Amino acid sequence: MRIEPEEIAETLEMISRHHLDVRTVTLGLSLRACAADDIDEIARRVYDRVTTAAGRLVPVADAISREYGIPIVNKRISVTPVAELIASCGARDVSPIAIALDRAGAEVGVDFVGGFSALVHKGIGEADRRLIDSIPAALAATQRVCASVNVATTRAGINWDAVLLMAHTIKACAAATSDRDAIACAKLVVFCNMVEDNPFMAGAVHGSGEPDEVINVGISGPGAVRAVVESLSPDADLTEVAEAIKATAFKITRMGELVAREAARRLGVTFGIVDLSLAPTPAEGDSVAAILEAIGVERCGGPGTTMALALLNDAVKKGGAMGTSRAGGLSGAFIPVSEDANMVRAVRDGALTLEKLEAMMSVCSVGLDMIAIPGDTPAETIAGVVGDACAIGVANTKTTAARLIPVPGKTVGDEVEFGGLLGSAPIMSVNGWAGTRLARRGGRVPAPLGGLKN
């Protein structure tokens, strides 16, 4: 395929003026060989494994960034779900493994380490429960470690016991970091249909079907897409808008493919996937909500928002799929409220509500992300919100998730500051009519008929 000089110039302009970057180069590592009978031995093996395997990740990524002029924002590590390592270890508190991961992450210089995780969509094993019980202490004691728990799949339905357990865990995480605006909750995601090759945090894990070591790359570029849409004629129809987004997504993805292949080659590991997700940052203009407003919605959250987001998501996937044969991960537009300046503005103006975000989740990637809510929100209400997110994922055979942050001492209208890529956000209201009966019923929500694909 011939690349014209003007296309190269366009890509350079995207980088220099519109915040185009590679959001993350994530090294996935298998920790299966680290399992042992003693918690301290597991922690030692985990530290040694990560520092040995990931020692060159940051220097290699930085060298690629310099040589090609492509900003790489984060270098990250994902590991085997830690619950899989502790079955033969009797320790009730397994947070020492998280602390070892955090120390190893600091040693090799990465920004985040994901994989303090468990998959409990059909039932909660003894090791899974110990890991989940350790999440609040683990996230409170670490800076880089992220946790995730899968509670539902289209094939299995929703584990309602796990949903309520995770709601209580979210509350416990908030309490454990109440002096830091519940920051532990920003590092915890509850999933439906979790994927094995997600390079983005906080939900990255290294799945059981992955090789021992693999590079997965997550692209970014909302600012570049917004600029392209804004450059169109005001009279351009939606087909033209979709075509322009598709062409831009292709260019962004080719950049991600280049970085992924080169990083894998230099590190001597497998090239896994390029995640086609558009990931916003708090920087002005680097916003998914700004794209929706450029398409024509007066304010993100207004009527037409879900349609515009569906158009955006579809066009990005189509363009990205032309740019790489290794598309994977979550691959869709992200809508994390605190990380998107235009979304924060929409919440402050009353245009964007939790219920509208739920509708948007049905057509994009993940969904209820980085949402700050009142600290006194009951666990049963949080369980209801998580359950709604899971129901959308189960029914539509897609990955959905909730990253909810009940901030102690804060109420609707207050502001919370997380810093860095996590941004800041106003506290959003939550419908108070959940009650307690539904959340406490327990059991499993049966899988839909659509889950029987064979």
List where the protein language model places each region.
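Anaerobic metallocofactor- and corrinoid-dependent redox/one-carbon enzyme cores
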Residues: 1-454
